[in-house]
Structures are given as structure tokens and as C-alpha cells.
């Protein structure tokens, strides 16, 4: 059975056909986001996918460092397995997300 994050990835890919996605399977560079997106305007951006049951979002120190170092064109997309559904955070808000949760 696929992990919740894998299911989230497949769902995102299905509902955003206008975005060209590259799934980054990177074990060599810790903290690198899960996805590289390319939109119709020719802009690249990264997305870290997270699935959570509670208010807190589990982010590694490497993921936090990546978003602090790359605050623009980077995002964290969080799927809450409950009534809050999906929220998108800019990479520049990483410390707020860590401190306050959803």
C-alpha cells in the first residue's frame, strides 16, 4: 500500500496537468524538496509535500535550512487528513510553520 505522501503526489499530478512535474528522489542531498515544477510562464519552483494528522508538520532540520536558504519559488504543500484539507505555504514562511503548525 502506498504511503500517504505518495498518494498525495499522485493526486497532485492528476489535478495539475498544466504543470510539468519532476519528482526528485534524492538521497544524496538532504533537505531537497520532493518536486520540481515548471509552469506555462516558464518559471521553475520547488514543492515539499507533507501529510499530517495533527496541527504540527514534521520537517527535518535539512528541509528547514533549504527553505530558509531558498525562500522564493519554494513551497510546502500540506495535506491534513481531516477537515482542513490542503494548505500551501511559501518557503519564506517555514519558521512560522515550524513554530505554529497549521
Where are these regions (language model features)?
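Nucleic-acid nuclease catalytic cores
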Residues: 68-96
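Acidic-basic catalytic patches of nuclease active cores, encompassing PD-(D/E)XK
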Residues: 1-26, 40
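Charged phosphate-binding loop/patch that engages nucleotide di/tri-phosphates or the phosphate backbone
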Residues: 99-102
Amino acid at each position: 500500500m502506498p504511503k500517504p505522501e505518495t498518494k498525495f503526489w499522485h493526486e497532485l499530478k492528476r489535478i495539475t496537468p498544466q504543470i510539468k512535474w519532476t519528482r526528485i528522489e534524492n538521497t544524496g542531498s538532504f533537505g531537497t524538496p520532493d518536486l520540481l515544477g515548471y509552469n506555462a510562464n516558464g518559471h521553475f519552483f520547488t514543492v515539499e509535500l507533507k501529510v499530517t494528522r495533527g496541527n504540527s508538520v514534521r520537517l527535518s532540520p535539512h528541509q528547514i535550512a533549504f527553505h530558509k536558504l531558498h525562500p522564493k519559488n519554494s513551497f510546502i504543500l500540506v495535506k491534513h487528513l481531516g477537515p482542513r484539507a490542503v494548505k500551501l505555504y511559501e518557503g519564506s514562511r517555514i519558521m512560522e510553520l515550524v513554530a505554529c503548525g497549521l
